[in-house]
Amino acid sequence: MIDRYINNKINAIWNDQNRFDTWKLIQEKYVETLEELKIAEAGIAKKIRKAEVSKEEVYKQEKVTNHDLASFVDILQKKVGEGSNWVHYGLTSSDIVDSANSLLIIQSIEIAQELILDLLKELKLKAIKNKDTKIIGRTHGVYAEETFLGNIFGNWYLEIKRSLDRVERAKVSIAYGKLSGPVGNHTVVTEEMEKITLEKLGLKPEIFASQIAVSYTHLRAHETVG
């Protein structure tokens, strides 16, 4: 994208470093759940939280593994040290990547919502200010009858407001993740472990999943906001 059209806040959300930090957050909350359920020994989640994994480290390791998530996990485990076997325990790459993408998309949508709200405020002000400003109305591209400029802004306001409602529904529809393992059947990670972890992240578990989460929800969000 051309630089001048980039929203800096949204761009920062999708920066690789923030993406890796989000992966780490999911790993932390997952291990925290394992600790609460007395599956993993206490203190590992805290070590994950304190560990810093830079994007440069992931890039370097990826030249060896040819896999970004595997590279990230390798580095995180080394930094955690004792107890690192619980990092990514029973999970598959898409458990982390798909769940993280849901979080990142939600954050992006929230930025878009802020911008839309600003636009609505401006349209409302212009509708009120120009409620008595007369203009020539058109039908079929030709002059028709006299109307008011405020009415034009009011119509735009309603259309944008309806779009904002659709964006909110898209945000709700995408608030799902998966932590159900390589084929989505909870062989190692139980439904309880998945549910507790995702709740900490503000997500719900997918009812059905395979290796990946259902992609339709992500597609719908992109379609609505785009």
Segments predicted by a language model, with ranges:
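A structural signal for small-residue-enriched, beta-sheet-centric alpha/beta enzyme cores
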Residues: I207-A209
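Single conserved hydrophobic/aromatic residue that forms the stacking wall/gate
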Residues: H218-G226
